[in-house]
């Protein structure tokens, strides 16, 4: 891979798994970037003029000739950087496997990432309050629960969806080192990012040790700091694919 001379700017919430997903991709490709941490609520003042009205992070400012001023949505960001910086690739060489990798990425984004969010915020509002019992933290959690319609019943349904998904991911990772093909792909980094909040939930750490080992390995490959919760886990990081 040649040296990449650019300095992208990633607008993010530091705790967002979708922002983590973009950082993993940028790190794996060796693309220099900086992050600007936005304040939830106030972030819309920064984003709306850049995105034409969109309010969600991540937003990437490529700051490159011939590129859009801003790219919103983690999937669109991955498409953009894969097109602009194809090596090392985050897609299999086979076109049918490329389609499969994007299909799994979309499934993780639209279903499993949301299920993880429900389970995580249900935990943080109950048994996980001690992680950060501050008034501000609890206010943010309650606002998130209200915004996304999270309650005990919806969180229980999310647990069931998550359990089925983890079974599928486990089988795929057991069959090979990667979810699709024989190299790291957008599917792997999406799984590693969106499932990382589960490291703060003791029951998941007990029931799915293989998951957190794989998440740690992918973070090592991408040169990304491990998420909160991993400091209490015994997992290995690998920096070779």
Placement of each model-derived feature along the sequence:
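A short, terminal or domain-edge coil/loop segment
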Residues: 89-100, 121, 142-154, 229-241
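Short, hydrophobic secondary-structure boundary micro-motifs
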Residues: 89-93, 179-182, 207, 227
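Structured catalytic/translocation cores of nucleotide/phosphate-coupled proteins
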Residues: 2-27, 31-33, 60, 162, ...
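A non-catalytic, amphipathic alpha-helix used as a structural packing/dimerization or gating element
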Residues: 96, 100-103, 157-164, 168, ...
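Long, positively charged, glycine-interspersed low-complexity recognition regions
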Residues: 198-241
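GST-like domain detector, emphasizing the conserved glutathione-binding G-site
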Residues: 2-133
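GST-like fold's C-terminal all-alpha helical module
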Residues: 110-210
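Alpha-helix boundary/capping residues
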Residues: 81-85, 108, 193-196, 218, ...
